[in-house]
């Protein structure tokens, strides 16, 4: 048999098989088929035929000429796929041992590559597929890595036996694990170029099947005989037979991921295209189309980590539509393919985030998270139903629960040095991160993508994403009905991330792309509030939770580092715009004070020493004639100390600027940023120049933020006309705190004065002058109110108020105890507004325990201390994340003096200056614009009736102008101010829950007369507020009379006002406006009703200063015969109208309705 075989090979040596192929295609095809048929005659001897073919191939190659044998070998494999191994094996053996070099256009490689073209041999479609599969199977199994060794003694490493192959493999593993050997040993898969060109020529179906087989996904090429080691002519390289991994299917490829990566990398390196990558990733991630006959060959989703570099390249070049289909296909895959598709999607994001630094020649786009994931998630959630919608929501929850997936971690910027660290080195991690431009661009692009996902799919999707975000951060329980999450998330909840400043930093960029007042902005603000609260809980833990403390020397500075870093970043760094930074700092201050003032809040940082309340309250010193309480360090003190230190430090730095400028010439300082430091251009001078430039920018920013905080701009969301009154109250308290912080710090005022003199920088000088003027004007206003408010409060102490409510503590209340009176009224209003008693009790305990500084009598305590405890009111209606309490606000305000005056003064200025807002059609409330300020002032009066109402009376007496008709702009402004003042007084008198405020307002008889003067000077706009004031006055008379002898003098004053305005009110009965006529009728009814009190009713006097007062007959209201006066005024008005020829229709109907019919 052997001799026979040798004869047929020998007989071919001088045949046309080794000649160039004929030019005629038909003749060529005939010769090829003839030789293929001839070869087929000798395949029966399965042992000898492979050896003969190998001998034939070894004698033919390498060859530089095109011969017929090239296409005969390829066509033989096509016709006899079962013998493909016998043909391919000798060729690849020559490649592995270095005898034959691969060339795409060389021989016989070009013939085998053309075999894979879908246009050839169409009549053999089934055999063609089998042949392609066999060729790829053999090439892949022998495409083992070979290491090029530079050391001479390693040239002969491994032989072709299996034992030697195994030992060689172990040596390779050791070499891979040894760092010092890595530079010398470079892995190379010698058959990858051939496989790459074959796959590029093959149709997509062949490519996909190949990648699934290599990845262990599907056994498409499971058939085939035994594989043997390649035959090597020389001992170069390490050709080995494949060693299958125990964990892979029988038909899988050892290290299939390495084969796939090698093939795809080869294409990129040689052709700079990624067509194979585009085919490989969907083939690996998506379940293959199967039939019942081949379902058993599907193994499922392969491990993703080995393909990280492949995914990185794919997502760098893929279109969003392609990646969206890929993501949906993965999320909707059946459990048989991916038991946990959600975990697979999350792992894919993790791999891409970790692969951002790959130096593969193709970098991910900066907005890859948006293009390939967030955009698809938003689209899926907009479908509202289906597997993709639910799994996309779950994927979003998982991504948000792991913030490092959403934004690049800060490790990208490690090792970066900063040359300028202003203000004591408070340099945040954000600044260090932004030193890497790629990180900044990625954060910005991702933030823009988040904003797009939130706003591009409608309000329903936006609301759902917001609730998912809050649930992922632990702000909402997963079981809440507001959180619409798939069962897969609720059943296996994740631990929420630890809220911190570094976690929230990237979200600041999202703010810049969100519409003002959107639900998304409110969501981010709630997350910010929760973040600040979490920082404060860590920095200043509650008293009960601090069981074990570290030594103060070790942790004192670390305890407040995160809080100070956050404050520093917002004040001077560019992590947020100036407008956003001022809003966030507003929240920081209010949350700090709320944490410090609420029950259980600690004012000591972690690691500080314990002090008893007696030590704090008793240790005081007299400063500037005022008793100032020495307070412990708390979050507000941390905020204040930073502001004071920053302003003073920047002022000192800028004062040095003119001295180091060129020749000290101030005329050259117009453009302060571009000043050139004199002297040689050295590193020191450049560093000094950078330091001065930074100081100028920081000063501009911090002054702008302080000016914004002082301008009563509420914190968070909404347009300027939709702020709640509670937010306006909080804004006023923040402004008062900032004002008094500067007023009580002489160095800080000196620093502001110095900044005013920086004429070389117009912005700094202007802002400093504006801020200094606002603080000075506000301080003078508060001082004036303090001095003038004492007579009004003294009048209240001489007018005890009787209430029908049951007493809280004692039946007899000392009239001089105004604080107890306010506390009693506050408690009653709390119950009316639905606040729980325990919260009020806690607030009272805070005051009684000395944690909140209090004032007594006429003593004026430190306003800086009071402001720290008082600015604790945070909105509850729109920003549910705020933990402030209105109950606590009222309880603390009732004990304060100057701060209450300060807040009233600021709110008054806002009342006067607020623009008039047009009512919107979709508005559900008529209270907009300046009317919200009226509500805010009413809240302050409810919290501290005596002091707040006294301050309002003083401000109203100063700003109320005469009612003179003028058509110019100044006249219109004057009327506008008067209307608002009258509206405010009417609202305050309508609130009968604050008797002290009612007494003070009713006692201001001159103010009430001026407020109701000139009722008919102008039209309806001015008459209506004045009639409202008369209406509430008439109702107040009825209430005050029931107090007994204590209310006689007050009722007399109000009755005199009504009598003075009676004739004008009767005249309004004939007004052309129906609204005015109706309101004047209401006023007259209330006047007549108050006159029906039994004049003979005797009211026993109360104990006053321990002395029983004599019996007094209360005739305050009934001594006036209102019925007769009304009838007389109606007759006079009728007579006047007859005399002038005016109609009596309206007047006659009103008189009849009032029981005072006109006589003909």
Swiss-Prot record:
Residues 158-188, 600-629, 800-830 are annotated as: Disordered. One of its GO terms (biological process) is rhythmic process. Its main location: nucleus. Involved in regulation of circadian rhythm, and in the control of the photoperiodic flowering. Acts as a suppressor of flowering under short-day (SD) and long-day (LD) conditions. Activates Hd1/CONSTANS gene. Belongs to the GIGANTEA family. The keyword Nucleus applies. Residues 170-187, 801-812 have a biased composition (Basic and acidic residues). Induction: Expressed with a circadian rhythm with the highest level 8 hours into the light and the lowest level at dawn. The peak of expression in long days is slightly lower, shifted later and the decrease is slower. Keywords: Biological rhythms, Developmental protein, Differentiation, Flowering, Nucleus. This is Protein GIGANTEA. It is found in: Nucleus. Residues 158-169 have a biased composition (Polar residues). One of its GO terms (cellular component) is nucleus.
């Amino acid at each position: 048999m052997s001799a026979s075989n040798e004869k047929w090979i020998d007989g071919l040596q001088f045949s046309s098989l080794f000649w160039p192929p004929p030019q005629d295609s038909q003749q060529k095809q005939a010769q090829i088929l003839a030789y293929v048929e001839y070869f087929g005659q000798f395949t029966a001897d399965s042992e000898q035929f492979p050896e003969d073919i190998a001998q034939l191939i070894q004698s033919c190659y390498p060859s530089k000429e095109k011969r017929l044998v090239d296409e005969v070998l390829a066509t033989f494999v096509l016709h006899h796929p079962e013998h493909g191994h016998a043909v391919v094996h000798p060729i690849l053996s020559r490649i592995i041992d270095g005898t034959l070099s691969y060339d795409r256009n060389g021989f016989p490689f070009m013939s085998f590559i053309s075999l894979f073209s879908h246009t050839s041999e169409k009549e053999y479609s089934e055999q063609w597929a089998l042949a392609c599969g066999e060729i790829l199977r053999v090439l892949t199994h022998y495409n083992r890595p070979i290491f090029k060794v530079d050391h001479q003694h390693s040239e002969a490493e491994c032989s072709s036996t299996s034992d030697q192959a195994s030992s060689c493999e172990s040596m390779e593993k050791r070499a891979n694990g040894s760092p010092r050997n890595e530079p010398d040993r470079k892995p190379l898969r010698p058959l990858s170029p051939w496989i790459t060109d074959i796959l590029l020529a093959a149709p997509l179906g062949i490519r996909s099947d190949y990648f699934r087989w290599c990845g262990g996904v599907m056994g498409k090429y499971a058939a085939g005989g035994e594989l043997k080691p390649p035959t090597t002519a020389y001992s170069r390289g390490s050709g080995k037979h494949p060693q299958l991994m125990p964990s892979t299917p029988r038909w899988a490829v050892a290290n299939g991921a390495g084969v796939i990566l090698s093939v795809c990398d080869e294409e990129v390196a040689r052709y700079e295209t990624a067509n194979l990558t585009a085919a490989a990733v969907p083939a690996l991630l998506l379940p293959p189309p199967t039939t019942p006959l081949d379902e058993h060959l599907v193994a499922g989703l392969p491990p993703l980590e080995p393909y990280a570099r492949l995914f990185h390249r794919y997502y760098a070049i893929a279109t969003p539509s392609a990646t969206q289909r890929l993501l949906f296909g993965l999320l909707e895959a059946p459990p048989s393919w991916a038991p946990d598709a959600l975990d697979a999607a999350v792992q894919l994001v993790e791999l891409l985030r970790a692969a951002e630094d790959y130096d593969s020649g193709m970098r991910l786009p900066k907005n890859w998270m948006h293009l390939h994931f967030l955009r698809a998630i938003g689209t899926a959630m907009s479908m509202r139903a289906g597997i993709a919608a639910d799994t996309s929501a779950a994927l979003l929850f998982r991504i948000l629960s792991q913030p490092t997936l959403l934004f690049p971690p800060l490790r990208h910027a490690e090792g970066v040095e900063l040359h300028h660290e202003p203000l004591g080195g408070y340099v945040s991690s954000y600044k260090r991160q932004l030193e890497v431009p790629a990180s900044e661009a990625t954060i910005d692009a991702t933030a823009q993508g988040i904003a797009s996902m939130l706003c591009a799919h409608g309000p329903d999707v936006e609301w759902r994403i917001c609730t998912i975000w809050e649930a992922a951060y632990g702000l909402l329980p997963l079981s809440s009905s507001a959180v619409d999450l798939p069962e897969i998330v609720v059943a296996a909840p994740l631990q929420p991330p630890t809220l911190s400043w570094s976690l929230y930093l990237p979200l600041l960029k999202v703010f810049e792309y969100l519409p003002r007042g959107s639900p998304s902005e409110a969501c981010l603000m709630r997350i910010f509030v929760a973040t600040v609260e979490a920082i404060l809980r860590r920095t200043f833990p509650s008293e009960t939770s601090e069981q074990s403390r570290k030594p103060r020397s070790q942790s004192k500075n670390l305890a407040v580092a995160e809080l100070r870093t956050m404050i520093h970043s917002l004040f001077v760094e560019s992590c947020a715009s100036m407008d956003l930074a001022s809003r966030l700092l507003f929240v920081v201050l209010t949350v700090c004070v709320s944490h410090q003032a609420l029950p259980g809040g600690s004012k000591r940082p972690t690691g500080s020493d314990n002090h008893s309340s007696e030590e704090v309250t008793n240790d005081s010193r007299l400063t500037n004639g005022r008793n100032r309480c020495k307070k412990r360090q708390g979050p507000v003190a941390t905020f204040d100390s930073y502001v004071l230190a920053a302003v003073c430090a920047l002022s000192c730095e800028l004062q040095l600027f003119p001295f180091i400028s060129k020749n000290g010439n101030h005329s050259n300082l117009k453009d302060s940023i571009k000043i050139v430091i004199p002297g040689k251009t050295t590193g020191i001078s450049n560093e000094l120049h950078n330091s001065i430039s930074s100081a100028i920018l920081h000063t501009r920013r911090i002054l702008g933020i302080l000016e914004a905080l002082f301008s009563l701009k509420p914190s968070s969301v909404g347009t300027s006309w939709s702020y709640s009154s509670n937010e306006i109250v909080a804004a006023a308290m923040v402004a008062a705190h900032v004002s008094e912080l500067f007023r009580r710090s002489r160095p800080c005022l000196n620093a502001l004065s110095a900044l005013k003199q920086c004429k070389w920088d117009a912005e700094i000088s202007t802002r400093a002058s504006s801020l200094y003027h606002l603080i000075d004007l506000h301080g003078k206003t508060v001082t004036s109110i303090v001095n003038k408010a004492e007579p009004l409060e003294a009048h209240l102490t001489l007018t005890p108020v009787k209430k029908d409510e049951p007493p809280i503590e004692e039946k007899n209340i000392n009239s001089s105890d105004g604080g107890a009176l306010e506390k009693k009224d506050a408690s009653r209003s709390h119950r009316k507004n639905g606040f729980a008693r325990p919260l009020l009790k806690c607030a009272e305990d805070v005051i009684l325990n000395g944690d909140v500084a209090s004032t007594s009598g006429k003593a004026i305590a430190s306003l800086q201390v009071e402001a720290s405890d008082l600015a604790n009111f945070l909105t509850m209606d729109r920003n549910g994340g705020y933990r402030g309490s209105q109950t606590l606000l009222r309880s603390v305000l009732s004990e304060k003096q100057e701060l209450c005056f300060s807040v009233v003064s600021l709110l008054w200025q806002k009342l006067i200056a607020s623009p008039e807002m047009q009512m919107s059609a979709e508005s559900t409330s008529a209270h907009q614009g300046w009317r919200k300020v009226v509500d805010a002032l009413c809240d302050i009066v409810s919290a501290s009736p005596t002091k707040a109402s006294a301050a309002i009376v003083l401000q109203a007496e100063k700003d109320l102008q005469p009612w003179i008709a003028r058509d110019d702009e100044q006249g219109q402004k004057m009327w506008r101010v008067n209307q608002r003042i009258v509206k405010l007084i009417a609202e305050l008198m309508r609130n009968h829950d604050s008797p002290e405020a009612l007494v003070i307002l009713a006692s201001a008889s001159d103010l009430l007369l001026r407020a109701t003067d000139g009722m008919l000077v102008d039209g309806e706009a001015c008459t209506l507020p004045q009639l409202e004031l008369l209406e509430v006055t008439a109702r107040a008379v009825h209430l005050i009379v029931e107090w007994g002898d204590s209310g006689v003098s007050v009722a007399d004053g109000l009755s005199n006002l009504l009598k003075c305005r009676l004739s004008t009110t009767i005249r309004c009965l004939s007004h052309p406006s129906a609204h005015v006529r109706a309101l004047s009728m209401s006023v007259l009814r209330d006047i007549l009703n108050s006159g029906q009190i039994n004049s003979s009713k005797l009211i026993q006097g109360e104990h006053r200063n321990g002395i029983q007062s004599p019996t007094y007959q209360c005739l305050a209201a009934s001594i006036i015969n209102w019925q007769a006066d009304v009838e007389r005024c109606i007759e006079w008005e009728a007579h006047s109208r007859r005399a002038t020829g005016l109609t009596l229709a309206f007047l006659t109907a009103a008189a009849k309705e009032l029981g005072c019919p006109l006589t003909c």
